[in-house]
Amino acid sequence: MEKLSVYMITKNEEKRLERSLEAVSKVADEIVIVDNGSTDKTEEIAKKFNAVFVYNTWKSFSAQKRYAQNLCANKWVLNVDSDEVLSDDLIKEINRLKENFTKNAYKLRVKDMYPGWKKPRLLSRTYNIVRLYHRDYMDMPDDYSNDRPVALKKNVTVGNLKAPVLHYSYIDLTQRIDKWNRYSSEFMKTAKGKKKKYSSLRLAMEFPFQFLRYYFVRRYIFCGFYGLVESMTAAYFRFVKIAKFREEEIFEREKINAEKR
């Protein structure tokens, strides 16, 4: 049977971490947690599950994930967030796979969960993303994010797991807005490094386009109140991240002009 390392990154996750670790401990031979300076009980909870708990200064989302992955002792790794819970059926599915992995990587079905939900809503959004993989067959890109998968090498075989991961990303609206704001700032830095360009037309159209995309294409329309709120806030911060990028361009030009004076 193959050994499996589970890795995650944290900061002040005492409200959600224990439920996540209770689930992953049923499949993991090793749990690695990289923390960015928690001041709550995150470390105490992690150590209840004998996790390797390491502090690392935050540079970017992808850098933190890569650092955690590279600390893993095993070749087979599972990338889980602290707000995600493996379903009972997925735990069984992964444990069966550990006896004989037939692919190089596997996509997990992630289902969003919101306050008051006992189970995922029918027709609500499900997204498939590579989270379980053999480290020899992938690269961690610099712009890695939860909705952008790891970069698989050529001729890699990918399987699909059937049972879901339950994603409890939403605590309350304040937490959600704070999270989106951090993500938009991170995007701005990544886009700046890639020398991207965004037009005024793109900026103007971003909010309405993204709202329609989230609400209808991503099926948040089936998530009731939280689906509407999530679509509005996500679309707004998609607009904000481009606005932050354009603002940074203005600041850079002002700095250059000031130096020329």
Name what the model sees in each region:
Residues E18, D40-F49, D89-L90:
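Acidic helix N-cap motif at the loop->helix transition within catalytic regions
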Residues A63-Q69, V80, S87-F251:
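Catalytic-site signature of metal-activated, phosphate-bearing donor transferases
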Residues E22-I31:
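Short, acidic, metal-binding catalytic loop of nucleotide-sugar glycosyltransferases
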Residues V77:
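Short aromatic/hydrophobic "clamp" motif used to bind/position activated sugar donors
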Residues M1-A23:
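N-proximal low-complexity "stem/linker" segments adjacent to membrane-targeting elements
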Residues D29, E43-L71:
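Conserved donor nucleotide-binding strand/loop of the catalytic core
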Residues A23, D35-E44, W58, D81:
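A conserved acidic beta->alpha catalytic loop
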Residues V27, F49-N50, N128, K154:
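Short, structured coil segments at secondary-structure junctions
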